[in-house]
């Protein structure tokens, strides 16, 4: 089996090294990732300039583009490697709740899913770098189960690993997405020339972390698996919307 691996933290990140190393024990691996950190770019494509594909000394390929670009190139350029699965991550920091809409890590998996390829996004609920051992041990458990009976139809799973010591992981839970409040205000500043600039403010606090959500369960020490879908249609609102637009 062939697994194409990407991320949004860049090809030099610790997370993608862990993901590639463990996955290589179960399948053939090819890494195609952004050349630099592209966190928060979501499903964006690079359309205003050409892309370049280069190979690093460790064998990983990198692209001067987005995670979505990487999936397109990974599936189009290599005649000797067509992915059976796409793994994205391991992201340095969680991708839970509505964060998934902004995540380039989740976007890479989403793009693969749109191509008909089963895809999984992996994230670690920690940005300090302290819990990579937990992520690696959890990944061994997850992939051993995954490859024992691989999915036969396209799936899109978002997996978050808790920020606890390896022995304190409590198991796996299937969880729905939680919610955050909207992000905090932009931060005004001045550049060295005295010109007005702005920084995007911090993320909002979590507003829905009850039992059964990814925020709640991962925060309680569980690995969370959330099945995602692409269809954004609000089906419960179809009748009300029709009544509004068809009213006399």
From Swiss-Prot:
An example molecular function term from Gene Ontology annotations: exopolyphosphatase activity
Pfam family, one: SurE
Cofactor annotation comment: Binds 1 divalent metal cation per subunit.
Cofactor(s) essential for the protein: a divalent metal cation
Subcellular localization(s) per the UniProt record: Cytoplasm
Annotated binding of a divalent metal cation, by residue: 8-9, 39, 91
Keyword Kinase: no
This protein's record includes keyword Nucleotide-binding: yes
Keywords: Cytoplasm, Hydrolase, Metal-binding, Nucleotide-binding
EC code(s) of this entry: 3.1.3.5
Main subcellular location of this protein, as a coarse class: cytoplasm
GO cellular component, one term: cytoplasm
Signal peptide residue numbers: none
Reaction catalysis annotation: a ribonucleoside 5'-phosphate + H2O = a ribonucleoside + phosphate
Function as written in the Swiss-Prot or TrEMBL entry: Nucleotidase that shows phosphatase activity on nucleoside 5'-monophosphates.
Entries under HAMAP family matching the protein: SurE (MF_00060)
Family label: Belongs to the SurE nucleotidase family.
Protein name: 5'-nucleotidase SurE
Organism whose genome encodes this protein: Neisseria meningitidis serogroup C / serotype 2a (strain ATCC 700532 / DSM 15464 / FAM18)
Lineage, opening ranks: Bacteria, Pseudomonadati, Pseudomonadota, Betaproteobacteria, Neisseriales
Gene name linked to the record: surE
